[in-house]
A protein has these predicted regions:
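Short aromatic/hydrophobic "clamp" motif used to bind/position activated sugar donors
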Residues: 43
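Conserved donor NDP-sugar-binding/catalytic core segment of glycosyltransferases
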Residues: 51, 55-85
Length: 206
């Protein structure tokens, strides 16, 4: 990284057990490297700019249930100044299965904690939406999925997918077709496509 991230990390070096800084094939390749060296029972990915919602959150989550395959919660979107913008348009349901993602990613990956027994590697054939596929594969394996009923993460508005909307939407359609079938995916994308067309008309741009 050449954006000053390493300098920030050095300030917190006493709290970081291992730092790797080397070339990679993109975001998801770097995350795969993290998965490969993870030694704990669970993984939780937060990207640069994202934060755990509050101190003691993990302790509270595991007090609710100590043996879930997947924990998920809500997300607070913040701007670059750390000001809260609000929650995501898609909100997590009280109960969650992989089938619920037919209409979109109901839980952001910043607010989902997954047992290492459920996880595989990110599929590097997807450049923008590999997290969607990764979460779906984990949910398919999971038997016990617990909703924390609280905000898990503060998510910095922007990022790779938002700056590449059209390629990201195309990848997500392909991923959903793989998991749900073409016609089911096409049907569920009709309202999404309508909203996108309205957006284009109103803004006269992509």
């Amino acid at each position: 990284s050449s954006d000053g991230t390493k300098d920030i990390i050095k300030r917190y070096s006493k709290s970081i057990s291992r730092l790797i800084s080397e070339p990679d094939k993109g975001l998801y390749d770097a995350m795969n490297k993290g998965l490969a060296i993870a030694k704990g029972d669970y993984v939780w990915f937060l990207n640069a700019g994202d934060e755990v919602a509050r101190p003691g959150l993990l302790m509270h989550i595991f007090d609710l249930c100590s043996d879930a395959d997947v924990y998920y919660g809500d997300t607070m979107i913040v701007d670059f100044e750390g000001r809260e913008i609000g929650g995501r348009r898609l909100t997590p349901p009280e109960t969650l299965t992989w089938r619920d993602f037919r209409k979109g990613m109901l839980v952001s990956h910043q607010s989902i904690i997954i047992s290492t027994k459920m996880t595989g590697s990110y599929d590097l054939s997807y450049r923008f939406s590999a997290d969607f596929d990764w979460v779906l594969r984990a949910l398919k394996k999971a038997n016990k999925i617990v909703y924390g009923r609280m905000i898990f993460s503060r998510f910095l508005d922007g990022g790779l997918t938002k700056s590449n909307i059209l390629p990201g939407l195309k990848e997500r359609f392909l991923i959903m077709t793989k998991h749900y079938g073409f016609f089911s995916t096409l049907f569920n994308h009709l309202p999404i496509a309508l909203k996108f067309i309205i957006y284009l008309i109103r803004n006269r741009r992509f």
